Amino acid sequence: MPLPTNQLRLAMVAGEPSGDLLAASLLGGLRERLPESAQYYGIGGQRMIAQGFDSHWQMDKLTVRGYVEALGQIPEILRIRGELKRQLLAERPDAFIGVDAPDFNFSVEQAARDAGIPSIHFVCPSIWAWRGGRIKKIAKSVDHMLCLFPFEPAILDKAGVASTYVGHPLADDIPLEPDTHGARIALGLPADGPVIAVLPGSRRSEIALIGPTFFAAMALMQQREPGVRFVMPAATPALRELLQPLVDAHPQLALTITDGRSQVAMTAADAILVKSGTVTLEAALLKKPMVISYKVPWLTGQIMRRQGYLPYVGLPNILAGRFVVPELLQHFATPEALADATLTQLRDDANRRTLTEVFTEMHLSLRQNTAAKAAEAVVRVLEQRKGRA
């Protein structure tokens, strides 16, 4: 059934940079499939705005991490969410699309759904990794879920939640065979010799917690592997400034800090030491051996430990369904342990070949033309709504 030619209005919310990237790809797909007059508004970042999105609030107002760290931002977040709900109910867009940020978006999605506005959520929360009733909240809030990973629709189906597997956009963007030599040329690194990429995170709290440990591990690795070089991307000038005291404290390190270009830095590497997060999936798609680590404040760690039931936190291990790369978390993330594990990943050629096979299979599974599939799913929801009207 064709969509109406009168003006469509879609409200969207992305709460952090990764969501901005996903939403921008979705917007690109929607703009190819919906009338040119369609309007897109809500809360988004610069990538969404570049796609013609009208952001009514600054996205960074919603960007938080951790249970304890978020407390100071709660009043402002609740105020924005209340204003957004009132706007949705007054303007009644054709659909509301929440992109990730489930703690913020589920409440908005439930309000939209209760008012007869179709609610779509892009990025299924990790219902497969956490205990509790989150899937019940999804069932109350979401009309249709756009899933990045192939095992998620079966879980949602049991809860009565309609969903579409759309793949992961990183798998579309990253080539199956990374150009390590070209990446080294781009960064001015030697063509030969071992290179380790180190990614301690992008937030002040992350650098404060794990940065000193990562730098101490790098110092140990250089002692044990004298020819090794390190490359560390700094996403912003503020992050580079935050890293500078650690760099100054370790002048002996053969370290190159890049302005952004994290994917190029990882492509140039033979092994990666990385803080847990989406970047671990990127490392897997680049077919790189890695060690995954994180440290969070004690109370946050206790809450996470009690809620989680999977034995792993890194996306490569979750997708493989087993430990294919080591994880060293919290008090296990000592400089000695990180150095030992990373050098093992660097030196073990048989393991490298095995990981290349595992990660290539993972890459092919996730490569689905996400922007097109996600946009087509949204259009189907809009068509179904028109059919019921």
From Swiss-Prot:
Q: What does this protein do?
A: Condensation of UDP-2,3-diacylglucosamine and 2,3-diacylglucosamine-1-phosphate to form lipid A disaccharide, a precursor of lipid A, a phosphorylated glycolipid that anchors the lipopolysaccharide to the outer membrane of the cell.
Q: Supply the enzyme class, top level.
A: transferase
What biological-process terms (Gene Ontology) are attached? lipid A biosynthetic process
UniProt keyword annotation of Ribonucleoprotein present: no
Q: Which reaction does it catalyse?
A: a lipid X + a UDP-2-N,3-O-bis[(3R)-3-hydroxyacyl]-alpha-D-glucosamine = a lipid A disaccharide + UDP + H(+)
Pathway named in the protein's UniProt entry? Bacterial outer membrane biogenesis; LPS lipid A biosynthesis
Task: Keywords in alphabetical order, please.
Answer: Glycosyltransferase, Lipid A biosynthesis, Lipid biosynthesis, Lipid metabolism, Transferase
* EC number(s) from the headed UniProt entry: 2.4.1.182
Q: Does the keyword Transmembrane helix apply?
A: no
Q: Which residues form a coiled coil?
A: none
Pfam families noted in UniProt: LpxB
Q: Tell me the protein family, please.
A: Belongs to the LpxB family.
Signal peptide range equals none
Instruction: Name it.
Output: Lipid-A-disaccharide synthase
GO MF annotation, one: phospholipid binding
Query: What cellular-component terms does GO give this entry?
Result: membrane
Species source reads Burkholderia cenocepacia (strain ATCC BAA-245 / DSM 16553 / LMG 16656 / NCTC 13227 / J2315 / CF5610)
